[in-house]
Amino acid sequence: MLFRSRVTLDLIGLPPTEGEIKAFVNDKKPGAYERVVDRLLASPRYGERWARHWLDTIHYADSHGAEHDMGRKYAWPFRDYVIETFNKDVPYARFVREQLAADVFFPDRPDLTPALGYLSAGNFDLSAYYTAPIPFEILDRDDMVNQAMSTFVSTTANCARCHDHKFDPVPTTDYWSLQAVFAGVIKGDVTYEDRPGLAKSEEHTSELQSPCNLVCRLLLEK
């Protein structure tokens, strides 16, 4: 029973139901453990659970971040793409290629366009667009370079924008070579049809948020 609880929490992030625990305990046939794992891996909840780790790694958010933190109305297709990819057990090498350059590697697959959301999933400082002392495109590509390096090489690279990295083997020449890779990338919004039930979901979220907003307002007034 302990195994059933732990493996269910690990793979889909939810506890097993009472019926699932009873079914496992009463399953005396060989391969009971394997059947449980196979069913959990086939569950759509598996992708929802494990996609979170990738989305956290690349700093995905439904808003731009920074002080304005404006919403990204059409960020969700990339999130759904990652979930679906985990559920389909897509090989890692292909998963990476789809996110970095789906339009180049798979030009006959327009349905992979949401994968390119990887390049704009992180923080986007809108105020710097108007106030940066250098062309904003350079700062934007700097984010892409750091995103790629931290995700795939587990190291930072932004120091090398001005000088060779003091701790990691990233010289300035390598940094600007990576910037050149992303020089042709221009961020923009792609409009998607709203998902079924989105309005109802947002209404429910607003209902849940209202008490929190009230408490925050009362605390600030004290």
Task: Please report, for each region that a protein language model flagged, where it lies by residue.
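Short, structured secondary-structure elements
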Residues: 3-202
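Short, small-residue-biased leader/transition segments that mark boundaries at the very start
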Residues: 1-2, 163, 204-210, 214-216
